[in-house]
């Protein structure tokens, strides 16, 4: 499990390899990740948008930006949490993801809540020892 906290917003990510959605012989590896966002702060916040950096095992970086998460822009009161699961296909058996959520307060202030960097590792990864 991976965790980051920004201004009272805790983001926890738990990734996993999805064998049944993958086809290693065709260089297709699918990963799912479950995210929990907890408002440990003292004011209401709303998740407005997301920004992901996805880096495959060859170092190729893809950036993904969009409104909300899984079609939602959840409002979190102090003490509330929101969880969702999404997925990421790669053409390599490993990679990593990191990013941020743009959050806004009731007063209209925006800030970036860090999404911790997390590794995507499949059992098909061949480790080389020199």
Swiss-Prot record:
Tell me the GO BP annotations in alphabetical order: error-free translesion synthesis
Disulfide-bonded cysteines: none
The record's InterPro entries line, in alphabetical order, gives: ApaG_domain (IPR007474), ApaG_sf (IPR036767), Uncharacterised_ApaG (IPR023065)
What the entry lists under PROSITE patterns is as follows: APAG (PS51087)
What domain of life does the native source organism fall in?
Bacteria
Any one Pfam family here would be: DUF525
Q: What span is annotated as the signal peptide, if there is one? A: none
Q: Where is the ApaG domain?
A: 3-127
Q: Which PANTHER family match?
A: F-BOX ONLY PROTEIN 3, POLYMERASE DELTA-INTERACTING PROTEIN 2
Q: What is this protein called in UniProt? A: Protein ApaG
Query: What organism is listed for this UniProt entry?
Result: Methylorubrum populi (strain ATCC BAA-705 / NCIMB 13946 / BJ001) (Methylobacterium populi)
Chain's gene name: apaG
């Amino acid at each position: 499990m991976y965790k980051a906290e920004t201004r009272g917003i805790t983001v926890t990510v738990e990734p996993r390899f999805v064998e049944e959605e993958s086809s290693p012989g065709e260089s297709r590896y699918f990963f799912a990740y479950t995210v929990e966002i907890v408002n440990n702060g003292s004011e209401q916040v709303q998740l407005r948008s997301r920004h992901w950096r996805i880096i495959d095992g060859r170092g190729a970086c893809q950036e993904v930006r969009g409104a909300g998460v899984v079609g939602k822009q959840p409002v979190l009161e102090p003490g509330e949490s929101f969880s969702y699961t999404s997925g990421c296909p790669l053409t390599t058996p490993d990679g990593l993801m990191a990013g941020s959520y743009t959050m806004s307060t009731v007063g209209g202030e925006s800030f970036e809540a860090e999404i911790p960097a997390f590794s995507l590792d499949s059992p098909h990864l061949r480790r080389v020892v020199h």
